[in-house]
């Protein structure tokens, strides 16, 4: 294969709607350009610095064909490795290199992987409201749109705070009460099943808001309502407790959106402590490690449900869809409808059809960034109050 030298790398941050989205653009001497997602919205400028000041000088003049070698070099070049900033920066480059290779081959990305194992991937979306009436309205809307899987949340992560008794002069933060959350969420499941029966699969995200003993109690209480899966019932630092949950409840567990390092998921998969891996592809370093993770999971009967929130580019979401139609053990894809500005900056962003997402058949990833449109929405940093989650006594808890 003829050498295809990397001639330029650019990292662009744009905020078309609520989130700062990071795109890496890799140009080659052949004239083929690739696009990749590097979004770490809580620390966007750190990722851009990593790309501009460290990866770009390292990669200019290298052969874009050698994706595996370049990925390994980027990962070890700083000596310390596998953190959210460096992994997202590497991911942006890695996805762009795969985009280039698929464009040169004149085939959509999933065909470069080895083709499809399914026609389309089932999708779930988010229904969230402070009241059951509001939640019913959202569920009804999504059922009309053909969704068979809906993530249901009563209030924001941690639930709707009601008359929380805090300490005097409480420290600033986002307060919630774990006992209230458990009680209200179990009641939410009960109400949904009574109203809808088994018309759709219910998913729910605990978002690490419980202590391990509470997580066990919660899993036991909602088991009767047969959720499709419960996400992030514990933080990555407490995954040994998953064995205790497994021993007392048959609830399907999904975990992984906070993982960066393979050591965080190896034991979970080998010991079958989870049913679904929820890794965020750019947080683990891009397509190259995602393919390896997918095949590793398949050997142990663990299914894939990549993290795919609105705070990632439609480029990254399209990569998830290509992975999902290829990997035989892919189960479902998360999706939140794109707003108009995001669709303008990222043309060809896919939307579900009757509860399914279809991979693009355009050569490459199939979604690019309109650089001129992106300039209309410059980066705007915000302090992220929601990650300052506090219990009634004022102590910080994992968000």
From Swiss-Prot:
Family statement: Belongs to the mandelate racemase/muconate lactonizing enzyme family. GalD subfamily.
Organism name: Vibrio harveyi (strain 1DA3)
Positions contributing to Mg(2+) binding: 205, 231, 257
Matches recorded under InterPro entries: D-mannonate_dehydratase-like (IPR034589), DgoD-like (IPR034593), Enolase-like_C_sf (IPR036849), Enolase-like_N (IPR029017), Enolase_C-like (IPR029065), Mandel_Rmase/mucon_lact_enz_CS (IPR018110), Mandelate_racemase_C (IPR013342), Mandelate_racemase_N_dom (IPR013341)
Function: Has no detectable activity with D-mannonate and with a panel of 70 other acid sugars (in vitro), in spite of the conservation of the residues that are expected to be important for catalytic activity and cofactor binding. May have evolved a divergent function.
Keyword Metal-binding set for record: yes
GO biological process: amino acid catabolic process
Gene Ontology terms for molecular function: magnesium ion binding
Protein name per the record: D-galactonate dehydratase family member VME_00770
């Amino acid at each position: 294969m003829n050498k295809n030298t990397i001639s330029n790398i650019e990292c662009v941050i744009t905020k078309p709607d609520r989130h700062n989205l990071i795109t890496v653009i890799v140009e080659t001497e052949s004239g083929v350009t690739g696009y990749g997602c590097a979004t770490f919205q809580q620390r966007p400028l750190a990722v851009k610095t990593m790309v501009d000041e460290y990866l770009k000088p390292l990669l200019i003049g290298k052969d874009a064909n050698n994706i595996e070698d370049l990925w390994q070099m980027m990962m070890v070049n700083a000596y310390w490795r596998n953190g959210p900033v460096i992994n997202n920066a590497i991911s942006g480059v890695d996805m762009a290199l795969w985009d280039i290779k698929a464009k040169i081959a004149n085939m959509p990305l999933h065909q470069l992987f080895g083709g499809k194992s399914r026609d389309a991937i089932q999708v779930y979306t988010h229904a969230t409201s402070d009241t059951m009436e509001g939640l019913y309205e959202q569920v009804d809307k999504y059922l009309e749109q053909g969704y068979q899987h809906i993530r249901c949340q009563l209030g924001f992560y941690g639930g709707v705070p009601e008359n929380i008794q805090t300490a005097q002069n409480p420290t600033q933060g986002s307060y919630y009460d774990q006992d209230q959350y458990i009680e209200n969420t179990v009641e939410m499941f009960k109400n949904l099943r009574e109203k809808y029966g088994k018309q759709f699969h219910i998913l729910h995200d605990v978002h690490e808001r419980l202590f391990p003993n509470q997580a066990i109690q919660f899993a036991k209480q909602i088991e009767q309502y047969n959720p499709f899966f419960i996400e992030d019932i514990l933080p990555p630092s407490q995954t040994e407790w998953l064995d205790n949950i497994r021993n007392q409840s048959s609830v399907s567990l999904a975990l992984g959106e906070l993982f960066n390092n393979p050591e965080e998921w190896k034991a979970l998969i080998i010991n079958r402590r989870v049913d679904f891996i929820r890794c965020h592809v750019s947080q683990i370093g891009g397509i190259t490690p995602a393919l390896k993770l997918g095949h590793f999971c398949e050997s142990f009967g663990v299914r894939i449900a990549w993290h795919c929130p609105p705070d990632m580019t439609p480029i990254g979401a399209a990569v998830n869809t290509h992975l999902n139609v290829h990997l035989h053990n892919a189960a479902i894809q998360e999706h939140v409808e794109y707003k108009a500005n995001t669709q303008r900056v990222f043309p060809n962003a896919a939307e579900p059809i009757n509860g399914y997402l279809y991979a693009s058949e355009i050569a490459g990833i199939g979604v690019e960034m309109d650089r001129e449109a992106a300039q209309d929405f410059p980066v705007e940093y915000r302090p992220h109050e929601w990650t300052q989650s506090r219990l009634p006594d004022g102590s910080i808890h994992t968000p």
